[in-house]
Amino acid sequence: MYDLTGKHVCYVADCGGIALETSKVLMTKNIAKLAVLQSVENQPAIAQLQSIKHSTQIFFWTFDVTMARQEMKKYFDEVMVQMDYIDVLINGATLCDERNIDATINTNLTGMMNTVATVLPYMDRKMGGSGGLIVNVTSVIGLDPSPVFCAYSASKFGVIGFTRSLADPLYYTQNGVAVMAVCCGPTKVFVDRELNAFLEYGQTFADRLRCAPCQSTASCGQNIVTAIERSENGQIWIADKGGLEMVTLHWYWHMADQFLSYMQSTDDDNQEQFVSGRR
């Protein structure tokens, strides 16, 4: 179990919907500090969070997840003055706009990766940090394809690939930063928006999604925090229909294990086995 007591948590997302409900639950876990980084100021939401736990320090910054990494570095230098250190980084910024592929990819994937690359040095044990946990909040259509929201699905598949890659022991054993993801199923705040399909053939299905059964943002937020508390490095969870399920991960490339051994080995025989395909 991952104990959130006394932790310094940084949440990159819009402070509404899933992010707000997740933050409400976090505030009941006796965290010491919560940094909320979002695109639009939402003081009523911040006040609502503060009312849950007065002793927890809450800091707010207006943040554009699509900014260049160089700008992010300057930004987080200021954030760290208030936070001192970050134990948990939660990436929850999301956009589903099939008519604006660049914005969808930049928000959901590129921006998230730049945020991680910027924050990791502050957490890295070999760079003076204390280790910690990175949580990427993503979607179930990052596990299974969506014929309706093709660009959104592609961006979320990228989040899963990035999460699994960064969770490799090659990194974790050195920097002490665990990486996990929570894939949210259809949630009310998402289906309430105007949604456009990637191609017009799918628009009927996009319109029907408004009436489809979906979980509440409160239920999803609760399960995101539960997944964090149960987390181990590299785990992928599904938060859907009020439940929580851990994903069984698979290696589809039959030489993946040999490739990793080859990367880590200086033995000529092992390298020859990889090239020849022998086990």
From Swiss-Prot:
Gene: Adhr
GO cellular component: cytoplasm
UniProt keyword terms in alphabetical order: Oxidoreductase
GO molecular function, one term: oxidoreductase activity
Protein name, entry field: Alcohol dehydrogenase-related 31 kDa protein
Active site: 152
InterPro entries per record: ADH-rel, NAD(P)-bd_dom_sf, Sc_DH/Rdtase_CS, SDR_fam
PROSITE patterns per record: ADH_SHORT
SUPFAM superfamilies: NAD(P)-binding Rossmann-fold domains
Family of the protein in this entry: Belongs to the short-chain dehydrogenases/reductases (SDR) family.
Organism lineage string: Eukaryota, Metazoa, Ecdysozoa, Arthropoda, Hexapoda
Species, as recorded: Drosophila guanche
